[in-house]
Amino acid sequence: MAGLLKKTTGLVGLAVCETPHERLKILYTKILDVLGHIPKNAAYRKYTEQITNEKLSMVKAEPDVKKLEERLQGGQIEEVILQAENELSLARKMIQWKPWEPLVEEPPASQWKWPI
């Protein structure tokens, strides 16, 4: 079964990936590289790094695509690749946004009170 390649994902606009393990290893490695530019105490880095390392170890350990899909629990492997691409994009944006830095100005005292 590992040698067979599916013809379609059944999802419009999402093509079949012929080398999903290689693609995921590249994406997860890039995500980890980008996270290295974020302070170690930032929550986003801490948790994203943990999840990405777990997923990368699954990709390295499981050669069968079907079993990998089940372990990752992210849908078809092409959907997992799309999620990784989106995470890489977000990680790059987080570096620009710097959410770990203090606010420019203090929020109003009643900002979090509801109802007003």
UniProtKB/Swiss-Prot annotation:
The keyword NAD does not apply. It is found in: Mitochondrion inner membrane. GO terms for cellular component: mitochondrial inner membrane; mitochondrion; respiratory chain complex I. The modification N-acetylalanine is found at A2. Keywords: Acetylation, Electron transport, Membrane, Mitochondrion, Mitochondrion inner membrane, Phosphoprotein, Respiratory chain, Transport. The modification N6-acetyllysine is found at K30, K46, K60, K98. One of its GO terms (biological process) is respiratory electron transport chain. It holds the Pfam family ETC_C1_NDUFA5. It is a peripheral membrane protein. Complex I is composed of 45 different subunits. This is NADH dehydrogenase [ubiquinone] 1 alpha subcomplex subunit 5.
